[in-house]
């Protein structure tokens, strides 16, 4: 999925859209995406000027956005909620771990796997890698919410 397709599903926009491209997915199973980390990201002005590092919470947010995309594509494949305007909200995080810093010039590879959906709560295994090395992981949860026009 190109950035244009990503933007059809996610409501996020600059500076908070943290998925640049979806490289692979299988509805109901997994989604892989990338985030190109540029020195031009606004958060690098203050985190940290001497040695810029992507904040861990933004790595988790990028993974959360990937979970929303997988939820949308899964519902779409099941032909569910087609006539509703839906938004997936980040509702939980467990076992978050940060193993390495992410710096300008890195390409963050995101992978989320659907574990289960119980009472409207989607649970995912989430990992972020740079050059094949694990930089962050967590179990993330999201929930769908119908948007009223």
UniProtKB/Swiss-Prot annotation:
Subcellular compartments: Cytoplasm
UniProt KW keywords: Cytoplasm, Lipid A biosynthesis, Lipid biosynthesis, Lipid metabolism, Lyase
EC numbers, comma separated: 4.2.1.59
One family name in Pfam for this protein: FabA
Segments passing through the bilayer: none
Keyword Nucleus assigned: no
Any GO BP annotation: lipid A biosynthetic process
GO molecular function, one term: (3R)-hydroxyacyl-[acyl-carrier-protein] dehydratase activity
Main location: cytoplasm
SUPFAM superfamilies, per the entry: Thioesterase/thiol ester dehydrase-isomerase
One Gene Ontology cellular component annotation held by this UniProt entry: membrane
Catalytic residues as annotated in Swiss-Prot or TrEMBL: 47
Enzymatic reactions: a (3R)-hydroxyacyl-[ACP] = a (2E)-enoyl-[ACP] + H2O
Annotated disulfide bonds: none
Family the entry assigns: Belongs to the thioester dehydratase family. FabZ subfamily.
Role description: Involved in unsaturated fatty acids biosynthesis. Catalyzes the dehydration of short chain beta-hydroxyacyl-ACPs and long chain saturated and unsaturated beta-hydroxyacyl-ACPs.
Record NCBIfam families: fabZ, PRK00006.1
Official protein name in the record: 3-hydroxyacyl-[acyl-carrier-protein] dehydratase FabZ
